[in-house]
Regions:
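Solvent-exposed loop/turn segments connecting transmembrane beta-strands
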Residues: 16-30, 47-57, 149-156
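Short, hydrophobic/aromatic-rich segments at coil-to-beta transitions
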Residues: 12-18, 40-42
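Cleavable N-terminal export/targeting peptides
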Residues: 1-14, 170
Length: 170
């Protein structure tokens, strides 16, 4: 049914699921679709949220274009965007006792909120190696990084920070 609603999905040559980590791919669980015409895309997500809503969230989205492919692997270029969000309320618990060491209790201490987001985007070139139903890929992108932290937006630099993925495909 979904294949009929979305023609791009109907043309998919293979699907992948696995682990992704990198500057322009994001970090976390990844899902990818590769089309028979050499185009593909990938999304990744890893949310970590505490009970007090302190959070660290990684997410990413990438477009691929296969340059050359054979039975053991492929070479490709990509264009990716990743985001990293963090929030720390600074609140913590402290164990406090009176002067006699009696009447001890936990006391909540309020801290200062630290919140920010970093975006990393750019093109990259990668190689992928296949074994049966598994693929491992290493890519070197040129990641342009910008961020917002403590009410200040800024350019954080351009860095060749690699991307890595380990995927199961069908």
């Amino acid at each position: 049914m979904i294949s009929l609603l979305f023609p791009v999905t109907a043309m998919a040559d293979e699907q992948r699921i696995g682990f992704v980590a990198g500057s322009t791919h994001g970090v976390g669980l990844g899902y990818s679709r590769q089309q028979s015409n050499g185009h593909g895309w990938q999304v990744s997500l890893l949310p970590i949220v505490d009970e007090d809503l302190d959070a660290t969230v990684f997410m990413g989205g990438t477009l691929f274009r296969t340059l050359n492919s054979n039975s053991w692997g492929r070479a490709y270029w990509s264009l990716g965007l990743a985001a990293f969000y963090h929030r720390d309320s600074g609140d913590h618990w402290e164990y406090v006792c009176d002067d006699n060491g009696e009447n001890c209790r936990d006391v909540e201490r309020t801290g200062q909120l630290d919140e920010g987001v970093m975006f990393s985007f750019g093109p990259g070139v990668g190689l992928e190696r296949r074994w049966k139903q598994f693929a491992i890929a290493l890519e070197l992108p040129l990641a342009v990084q910008v961020g917002y932290n403590n009410k200040s937006f800024g350019f954080l630099g351009m860095h060749p920070i690699p991307n890595f993925s380990l995927m199961y495909f069908w």
